[in-house]
Amino acid sequence: MKGSPFLENVSSGNVRMRTQDTQPRRIDSVSDDRFLTVGTESFAGIHLLLDLWDASGLDDADLIERALRDSIKIAGASLLHIHLHHFTPSGGISGIAVLAESHISIHTWPERGYAAIDLFMCGDTHPELAVPVLKNAFG
């Protein structure tokens, strides 16, 4: 997508991300199949990938679930189901929040202070608004 405003690299504090979109955006239309149109470009949704370093609370399933729920709410998405799996003995957690508009997944390595988070949302949602919620939850 050469010249597209939707692809850029961002580095902010302990969060490094490559994302299609980091700012609230104007959506020209949302089709019946939930595809977005901005200008002349149509796409399935907004995909954000977050790498959190020096993160904390990564072995706390309750904290992770709260962070997922809070980020879903602020993004304007609809939660269908959350499933978290706590690995032992390392304490890492992998989980997914299944949304009517797609998903948020998380994989944590508390022994390294690292979490990988994947947000994909279609329709009239704003996944970029979830980024500060997730940064604050694990910062």
Model-derived features: positions:
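Polybasic/polar functional segments that serve as interface/processing modules
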Residues: M1-G139
